From Swiss-Prot:
Taxonomic path: Bacteria, Pseudomonadati, Elusimicrobiota, Elusimicrobia, Elusimicrobiales
Domain KH: 558-617
E.C. designation(s): 2.7.7.8
Organism: Elusimicrobium minutum (strain Pei191)
Keywords: Cytoplasm, Magnesium, Metal-binding, Nucleotidyltransferase, RNA-binding, Transferase
NCBIfam families assigned: polynuc_phos (TIGR03591), PRK11824.1 (NF008805)
Binding-site residues for Mg(2+), renumbered to this chain: 490, 496
Protein name: Polyribonucleotide nucleotidyltransferase
Required cofactor(s): Mg(2+)
């Protein structure tokens, strides 16, 4: 360590010290930083091509990967292949959090391929790795030669016993009723992701206000490290549309774009008319610009649509589909439409439609989740699918991408606080949201449809849950908050803010801001208030369709019963080589799951089959009771008496003197092998040996 040239910047946030280190690991990267808190260490590296991609684009070619090395927690990966492979759900979600925090801060027109990798090197099981990953990633970019100049920091805000905590420990997080990851710059908020247990709108705002001072401290620390170890930024030249094309667009085509947007067409009609206008534009400039004509026309039309749609909102308070800023699209819902599914709902909001289906399973159907900190069974799952046909696109079906995983997790987090506890409803629950149509807010359709589907399945939820996506149009000091945004408003707007919850409070919160300076707390307060109003309107609609969970689960769902047996009886229930449990499941047509703590779950196709399996289990795991009368089977005859099997695996001695009231010379005078005999337990000694009597019953 003596030859290492390390530069360090320490910063205290709350009561915890965070260290930023550079100059000693991954030195060939454009920027590399280790963020450390306690014994938790996250290395982030930033590498960029120095050449712009050809063409004009407003898309930043940024790739972010968050990786957890199992050695960080002193573990070896499970499974057949003993190495890390496909990204876990946590790694995917953490990658999205980092990406969403960084992307708005890259300069306009920057198209150099850029990779950011955050790698967990050490995990002490105390401190969170995700906020350290955001911090390390931003700092790696700040000190690098990459033209990324605005630091972004993230903190985790939890509320424990009514008190807000900055960066709670992993143990504290388990008891928090609110858990938000919030990132921002010195200017404002950029990204929020988290969940809560039906908290108020005011509580969420307080959490954001608690986060801002901590974010400012962390951003300043990055700038201080840059002063010590920063590199000179390389310059780039962004390509632009030729001025003659811009002028033609403004002078001839702007008015036509405005007319199309002011006609309040539906998505398909509007897209067709804009495409026709683009084709005419491209044809007009083809002679002057050749093969670039279509690209230049497309970019110009995109810019004109951006400007005119925003002007429509800010100047007239009207959106491109004719709605007011706080107006919700038309709602329509159906439940119980799939006869064999355990629960189903078709939720439609405008041109966005989700088919959401609930399936009930047993504890054996739970998803095993393994992380650096712990392993556990996930008994509530929500999977989101976004096929190409939902937007009229012809594209191949592939495995779920980051977007699908992220949307599914948001919807799962929204519904999770309202799912009943396992002791009240012992089913594993899987909800699948298949998006049938999409024109914005499909994740919120998954939440609303998911709630209705769970109600239809007879899941006794604590309350119904609705969700809404909000947008923002901001030019200077003038702005408008939009309720229930559609696809165009998401694409051309400055914010995508999603809020979910019951009538009692908020359960999930997600926000992404495209403005480099973020947005203020004041705008967020207005957005939250407007979102709550819209969410209650949607909730009223849902209540009109299915106001409460159905009283019973589907007749096609398994019948489940949970019981507990002594842990020392688990072996007796399973039997040698699984003989006993296999016999029970086959003869009763049931599925039986046995936990190490003695909890046994029986799933059957009907109540009769379940009762048969339950009786078999009780028989195999019962304890012999003193003074109780049993009908047992003679399994062994000895000169001194007979051994009688009282319950499976448990015999008692019936001494020759206890067989009959009169004296007998041989046991065989009264009993023979296989006889069923009624006996009473008269003694159980300290070693568990059982003595029986027949004569006391004669």
């Amino acid at each position: 360590m003596s030859n290492i040239n390390k530069t360090t910047q320490d910063v205290i946030v709350g009561d915890k010290t965070l260290s930023l280190e550079t100059g000693w690991v991954a030195k060939q990267a454009d920027g590399s930083v280790i963020a450390r808190m306690g014994d938790t260490m996250v290395l982030a590296t930033a590498v960029s091509d120095k050449v712009q991609k050809p063409g004009i684009s407003d898309f930043v070619p940024l790739t972010v990967n968050y990786k957890e090395r199992t050695y960080a927690a002193g573990k070896i990966p499970g499974g057949f292949f003993k190495r890390e492979s496909r990204a876990s759900k946590k790694e995917t979600l953490a990658s999205r959090i980092i990406d969403r925090s960084l992307r708005p801060l890259f300069p306009s027109g920057y198209t150099c391929e850029t990779n950011v990798t955050a790698m967990v090197l050490s995990a002490d099981g105390v401190y969170d790795t995700e906020v350290l990953a955001v911090m390390a990633s931003s700092t790696a970019l700040i000190i690098s030669s990459i033209p990324f100049t605005t630091p972004v920091a993230a903190v985790r805000i939890g509320r424990l016993n009514g008190n807000f905590i900055v960066n709670p420990t992993l143990e504290e997080q388990k008891s928090c009723d609110m858990d938000l990851i919030i990132s921002g710059s010195l200017e404002g908020m950029l990204m929020v992701e988290g969940g809560a247990k039906e908290v108020s709108e005011e509580d969420v705002i307080k959490a954001l206000e608690t986060a801002k001072p901590a974010i400012d401290i962390l951003c300043k620390a990055q700038l201080e490290l840059k002063e010590k170890a920063g590199k000179e930024k390389f310059s780039f030249q962004a390509e632009t549309v030729p001025q003659d094309v811009v002028d033609l667009g403004n002078n001839k085509y702007r008015a036509e774009v405005a007319n199309i947007l002011n006609a309040f067409y539906d998505k398909q009609t509007r897209d067709v008319k804009i495409a026709e206008l683009k084709a005419a534009f491209a044809e007009e400039i083809k002679e002057a610009h050749g093969d670039n004509a279509s690209t230049f026309a497309g970019i110009t039309m995109e810019n004109l649509s951006y400007e005119e749609s925003r002007k429509l909102v800010l100047e007239k308070g009207v959106r491109v589909d004719g709605r007011k800023t706080d107006e919700i699209r038309q709602l329509n819902s159906i439940t119980g439409l799939l006869p064999r599914a355990h629960g189903s709902a078709l939720f439609t909001r405008g041109q966005t439609q989700g088919l959401v289906v609930t399936t009930l399973g047993t504890s054996g159907d739970a998803q095993l989740v393994e992380s650096l900190e712990e392993s556990y069974d996930e008994t509530f799952m929500l999977h989101y699918n976004f096929p190409g046909f939902s937007t009229g696109e012809c594209k191949p079906d592939r495995a779920p991408g980051r977007r699908e995983i992220g949307h599914g997790e948001l919807a799962r987090r929204a519904l999770l606080p309202l799912i009943p506890d396992a002791d009240k409803f012992p089913y594993t629950i899987r909800v699948v949201s298949d998006i049938m149509e999409s024109n914005g807010s499909s994740s919120m359709a998954s939440v609303c449809g998911g709630s209705l589907s769970l109600f239809d399945a007879g899941v006794p939820m604590k309350a119904a849950c609705s969700g809404i996506a909000m947008g923002l149009i901001k030019e200077g000091d003038k702005y408008a908050v939009l309720s229930d945004i559609m696809g165009l408003e998401d694409h051309l707007g400055d914010m995508d803010f999603k809020l979910t919850g019951s009538r009692n409070g908020i359960t999930a919160f997600q926000m992404d801001v495209k403005l480099a300076g973020g947005i203020s707390i004041e705008i967020l307060k207005e957005a939250v208030a407007q979102a709550t109003k819209g969410r209650m309107h949607i909730m009223d609609h849902m209540d009109s369709v299915l106001p409460e969970p159905r009283k019973d689960v589907s007749k096609f769902a398994p019948v489940i019963y949970t019981m507990r047996i002594p842990q020392d009886k688990i072996g007796a229930l399973i039997g040698p080589g699984g003989k006993n449990i296999k016999r029970i499941t086959e003869t009763t047509d049931t599925k039986i799951d046995i936990n190490d703590d003695g909890v046994v779950q029986i799933a059957a196709v009907n109540g009769d089959k379940l009762a048969m399996a339950k009786a078999e289990i009780e028989l195999l795991t019962a304890e012999v009771e003193l003074n109780k009368i049993y009908k047992g089977k003679v399994v062994s005859i000895q000169p001194f008496g007979a051994f009688v099997e009282l319950i499976p695996g448990k015999d008692g001695l019936l001494h020759i003197s206890e067989i009959d009231k009169k004296r007998i010379n041989k046991v065989e005078d009264v009993l023979k092998m296989g006889d069923i005999v009624e006996v009473k337990v008269v003694e159980i000694d300290n070693n568990g040996k059982v003595r029986l009597s027949r004569k006391v019953l004669l």
